[in-house]
Design a protein with these regions (language model features):
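Conserved hydrophobic helix-helix packing surfaces used for dimerization/oligomerization
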Residues: 41-42, 67, 143
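Phosphate/diphosphate ligand-binding glycine-rich loop within oxidoreductases
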Residues: 1-29, 150, 158
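Rossmann-like adenosine-cofactor binding region
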Residues: 91-167
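Adenosine-phosphate binding glycine-rich loop
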Residues: 27-33, 140-142, 146-223
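Short, well-ordered alpha-helices that flank and scaffold nucleotide-derived cofactor binding pockets
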Residues: 21, 25, 56-60, 82, ...
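NAD(P)-binding Rossmann-fold cofactor-contacting core
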Residues: 63-91
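Glycine-rich adenosine-cofactor-binding loop
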Residues: 13-16, 23, 27, 31-59, ...
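Conserved S-adenosyl-L-methionine
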Residues: 60-66, 162-165
Length: 223
């Protein structure tokens, strides 16, 4: 390629792949496999910028066939639905409810495979309170709360009390940083591949060590 030596600027949203890999790692760490049959439902709390990244990640995960957004600002970010309809290849892949409707949100979360909370610290405490009062029926899905201070969040504690598995924002932070390193060093020489989760499992011993060292450094920085 005669243009190969010409410098170029590329922009990447590493939040997207970071979210996907954080979910994937949680499954692997528990000895589980993610089902690729588009039978899963994802619930996203909020409809701001990070929620957009979360929806993009959901669209790339073959396990997800339906996405529910609990909108804090109904009527804003109207691009979410068209993206879901374009990239999730099922009938009616998107639904939106209001963030303040605790009953509707808990009903969706109870049946969800993945729940993503991208809203600011303490903004989801009312959801945690509603969850704490939701009786004994289990919530079996995986929650990713992007907040990493405090750890765990009130929402994570309530989720775990109902039998669900919850991971904090440090997992997303770690994997988006790992993707950045892979891009900047040329290990991934183009956009993060669509099969990045599988490729992450197939990395070399050196790459495994990189992930371990980055995880250790992150934990030390957050302590």
């Amino acid at each position: 390629d005669k243009n190969a030596a010409i410098p170029a600027i590329r922009l990447y949203n590493t939040d997207v792949k970071g979210i996907e890999l954080a979910f994937e790692h949680s499954y692997r760490a528990r000895g589980m496999r993610m089902d690729s049959g588009q039978d899963g439902e994802a619930v996203i709390i909020g409809n701001g910028n990070t929620a957009t990244s979360a929806l993009a990640a959901c669209c790339m995960m073959p396990e997800i066939g339906h996405i529910v957004v609990a909108a804090r600002h109904p009527g804003k970010n109207t691009g979410l639905k068209p993206v879901a309809e374009k990239f999730v290849n099922v009938h009616n892949p998107y639904n939106e409810i209001e963030f303040g409707d605790d009953q509707a949100l808990l009903e969706e979360a109870r049946n969800a495979t993945f729940v993503f909370n991208p809203i600011p610290v303490h903004a989801a405490d009312n959801v945690a309170d509603a969850l704490a009062d939701a009786g004994t029926e289990p919530f079996s899905g995986l929650l990713l709360d992007v907040i990493y201070v405090p750890r765990p969040t009130k929402l994570m504690e309530a989720w775990r009390a109902h039998g669900g598995h919850a991971i904090g924002g440090e997992e997303m932070l770690l994997y988006q940083a790992l993707v950045q390193v892979l891009l900047m060093t040329g290990i991934w020489d183009d956009d993060p591949p669509s099969d990045a989760a599988q490729r992450q499992q197939d990395t070399t011993t050196e790459d495994d060590q990189l992930e371990l060292e980055m995880r250790k450094a992150l934990e030390e920085a957050m302590d």
